[in-house]
Amino acid sequence: GKTRFVQETLADDYFSGGERNLVIACEEGVEEYEDELLQKTNTTLVVLEDKSEFNEMFLAECQKKYKPTQIIVEYNCMWGLDYLREMYMPKGWFVAQVITTVDATTFDVYLKNMKSLFMEMAKDSDLIIFNRSTDETPAATYKRNMRAVNPKAQVVFEKEDGSQLEFEEEM
């Protein structure tokens, strides 16, 4: 999911070449970051266990200690985006892009049980990636749901192997 996406982004020379990267992971995921990749891409990983740790003082300490030129926040959506939006960022820090990753195999369940939380996440996204998509994924329906919330977002469907799912869009 998110961790794999971040690792693929870091592995891209266009993104991380010559930069001092900082990844702030706001939850332990299923997948772990590869130490070799972190070293190769000049990336420091900081993992937080609790929302209370993610605050303005923490961000200021990260700026002072690591002096990053690029920051990726692997955010825990359960904390709510307003929490992040309202936080004072260190000088030079800004949100360049909001990317939301969605597990296509569990999207229906999330939508039924946590619709408002998910829609809040999607409304500010520049890019929404449905990963773990298959030929059975109702991609046109999912894309229509996302367009209703955020017509400006780019919506893509990615298969397990990283290739994009091709599908017919409904009119």
Range-by-range predicted roles:
Residues 59-62, 112-115, 164-171:
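Short, surface-exposed amphipathic charged segments that create phosphate/polyanion-binding patches used
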Residues 1, 121-124, 169-171:
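Unusually extended, aromatic-enriched hydrophobic runs near protein termini
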Residues 3-97, 104, 108:
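Nucleotide-state-sensitive switch-loop elements of NTP-binding domains
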Residues 73-157:
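Phosphate/Mg2+-binding loops and adjacent switch elements
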Residues 151-171:
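Long, charged, low-complexity intrinsically disordered regions
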